[in-house]
Amino acid sequence: MQRRLSQHGLKCRVVYDGTNALKAVESKTPDLILLDVILPDINGLELLKEFRAKHSADELPIIMVSAFNDVDSTAKCIKLGATDYLPKPLNGTILMAKAVASLEAKYFREANQKLLEELHIRATTCPLTGIFNRKVVFDHGENAFLERNSGEGKDFSLLSVDIDFFKKVNDTY
């Protein structure tokens, strides 16, 4: 497995038991885990549960590997949070395809999240000043007003300043 993945430019860290796997993931979270169901010290399914308690499937894809090649084993792994399942003996082509697909999905989700954050910033701030735009001010003002009228909120004040031809001032200075 390691050789096949390394040949395709993927860096691999190999551990041979669950205890060291936990330590390795805790010290540096990998982009992808290939996890055998049968380990010398901890059941791979229990280890999967521990990883899922700390990392979502979006942030840490885990492909389970097992000699059990039946529907129930596959379903159990997926139900516990595995991203995918590979039966032994491993087929190198399928291994690479599933590893690449899992990594691409993770990277696309991360890129989409960054774009959403950037879009949110653009939608809520003025590009010239970097302060909140009118929509945000009106939304927050409306919420504060509603809270105040319901008796739940505190007193509030709102100051609106409008500078004519601000873009010209900003471009000049």
Please place each PLM-identified region on the residue numbering.
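Active-site beta3 strand of CheY-like receiver
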Residues: 28-34, 39
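C-terminal output helix
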Residues: 89-99
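Acidic catalytic/metal-coordinating carboxylates
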Residues: 17-20, 43-46, 69
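Conserved nucleotide-binding and Mg2+-coordinating catalytic segments in signaling enzymes
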Residues: 120-140, 161-173
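Short amphipathic alpha-helix used as the core "switch/output" element in two-component signaling
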Residues: 23, 45-58
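Two-component/phosphorelay signaling modules centered on CheY-like receiver
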Residues: 1-13
